[in-house]
């Protein structure tokens, strides 16, 4: 069921989303070659704590037999890893890596979700273009995140923009509603038909998240039960924000 947030709930969402944005700011300022993904995870956890929040991801139970609850405060995915990479003291970030960090701050019972792909050191032109296209895909999508439009309008805009740039969108994972729960209705694919899906109403809070692959759209899951990689080894990028549907233009809650 899609939830329409009250004025009070929207204020609580803004608070949680501000923590998410501040946490990404701390990561952006700190990330460099030689750090481990666990180092980044610790920075995120400490920053969320500083602002009165906790990670909604840590301890998350996917409800899949044999897959343990998620062990970290962030998902950190490097190069050909698309999403859900598990931070590790053994995983060292190198010059030229693109590093996707997805995090959800939980504060006062509400969630703020955002992902960024960070370019570390001397990144190739191809990698830089992928990251830039992925970010722009988000902004192409939210042009249609307006009262009276439909979910499919957002999905179509993202998918078509990515296609025209010569890349592929991930089809098995998607954006989602967000609020008291990290994942709420509706699902928001990164491809689809304009004019389809539920109508957008003021008070909806949505996590829009293009996940873009340089090569073919096929993906694989690693044995850890979490990490998703590209099947062909090509690079992947991820850009996400939590937005609010209003009477006019959408409000992006996870950008400072």
What are these regions (language model features)?
Residues 1-256:
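Active-site neighborhoods and metal-handling regions in enzymes and metal-associated proteins
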